[in-house]
Amino acid sequence: MQSSEVKPFSRLRAYLCPIYKSEFSKFVPLFLLAFFVGFNYCLLKNMKDTLVIVGSDAGAEVIPFLKVWGIVPGAVIVTMVYGWLGSRYPRDTVFYCFMAAFLGFFFLFAVIIYPVGDSLHLNSLADKLQELLPQGLRGFIVMVRYWSYSIYYVMSELWSSVVLSMLFWGLANQITTITEAGRFYALINTGLNLSSICAGEISYWMGKQTFVAYSFACDSWHSVMLNLTMLITCSGLIMIWLYRRIHHLTIDTSIPPSRRVLAEEGAATANLKEKKKPKAKARNLFLHLIQSRYLLGLAIIVLSYNLVIHLFEVVWKDQVSQIYSSHVEFNGYMSRITTLIGVVSVLAAVLLTGQCIRKWGWTVGALVTPLVMLVSGLLFFGTIFAAKRDISIFGGVLGMTPLALAAWTGGMQNVLSRGTKFTFFDQTKEMAFIPLSPEDKNHGKAAIDGVVSRIGKSGGSLIYQGLLVIFSSVAASLNVIALVLLIIMVVWIAVVAYIGKEYYSRAADAVATLKQPKEPSSSIVREAQESVEQEEMAVL
């Protein structure tokens, strides 16, 4: 839907809300849909961590095993189901099917599965595995023992990849034009960050106050879980209504319903035929990545972030679990961290990111994330090593024990890392694709966003599994983890410096090519230059 309004925005309007009046009927439900998707994601993220870390015997050591042996197979199965449904049904039916599956499972877990969890858990099998396997595989044994918690963790994690990445962004990319996307997406990302603030505060408040008292609740944590699950269910129903509204707004009403169904079935069949080709092209994707130093550097940057954030988070959550031993307290703490991540992300996006990149360039913007993670990581591990030796650094001044100070420093490290990732890291990564040719963009994004990021997440878990087998616990392997993190971040910073030089060189070449006098019309040159500038500004 193109806007018929051509009047330019005022400077303030262009900065705060660059949306035409005729576009509000599409933008507002899309913005609200993004908000509720993010809202549910944040609530689920905190609850899944609380369940598996506090509710199990292994603490944070179970997370690396869940990410490899739970999430990876789950993602493969869901992708296959998504492809099967997408090849046979229209996009709205696929959305409703997945929403019904997710909401139905979360409701069923909170109301039925969790109260009878003790009788469902595989205690006898886990006891036998405990006799056979080394102590370092305790996380794997716990994953098997508390299988219902593990499935909840996997389903909550898949909410992000399925509902947010596949369904929501798939819809957004399908119904928005390129010019609309440049103006819509920045505000939609702000909506996602705002949902983090709201979800964090509501989750924290529900841990302190009883919203609705349930007579069948097993304990205080079950009561909190029931209230949060009802919120998730209501939010999901609102999402279904918003999706239906967007779907009806964007379909072409001039086409008769019978022909519209045939057209959607034809598109689904075409998608199925196209999905048979990628296996032949997968090798070309990686060859393309390896043959280009620029794309290989971007892949290393994305891989480094995913490795570093996962290695940091397991250590931090292990420290937090030693302080907050109850479900309600742990969930409340994680909820406050979620709120702070949203606040930092919004403030950084509005006040820092665009201005910093415009003033000091791509390299400085891309260095912000690794430098912030390096400095905060050094402080975090410094407080951990001090706590192990019972040395009080600032604890006496702040009124904290060494362990509490280590957990607090880790929380701030996570807030700053996530905040800079959602702003500086994501935007500079997207900007790095702009000077590339269309072929490099398509192949590079497919390989980096689709495969490399997943390898990074799984790679961090595999590193932990190896260390746990050798050292038996996270605490015993801290020295090695710190060294691995330091090496990764140094490599990350060096690669950013190299890519920065290449980025400016490629950008200058692209502009020089556009300015060549061989072009038949100067207006074409101007339009091409403006399109490049608009693409770069859309990212900022």
UniProtKB/Swiss-Prot annotation:
Would you tell me the protein name for this molecule? ADP,ATP carrier protein 2
Q: Where in the cell is it found?
A: Cell membrane
Q: Does the keyword Ribonucleoprotein apply?
A: no
Q: How does it sit in the membrane?
A: Multi-pass membrane protein
Q: What lineage is on file?
A: Bacteria, Pseudomonadati, Chlamydiota, Chlamydiia, Chlamydiales
Keyword annotations for this protein?
Answer: ATP-binding, Cell membrane, Membrane, Nucleotide-binding, Transmembrane, Transmembrane helix, Transport
Superkingdom in the source lineage: Bacteria
Question: Belongs to which family?
Answer: Belongs to the ADP/ATP translocase tlc family.
- Tell me what organism the protein belongs to: Chlamydia pneumoniae
One GO molecular function term of this record is:
ATP:ADP antiporter activity
Q: Does the UniProt entry include the keyword DNA-binding? A: no
Q: Where are the transmembrane segments?
A: 24-44, 62-82, 94-114, 151-171, 223-243, 295-315, 337-357, 367-387, 391-411, 458-478, 480-500
Query: Major place of localization?
Result: membrane
User: Known PANTHER family for this protein?
Assistant: ADP,ATP CARRIER PROTEIN 1, PTHR31187
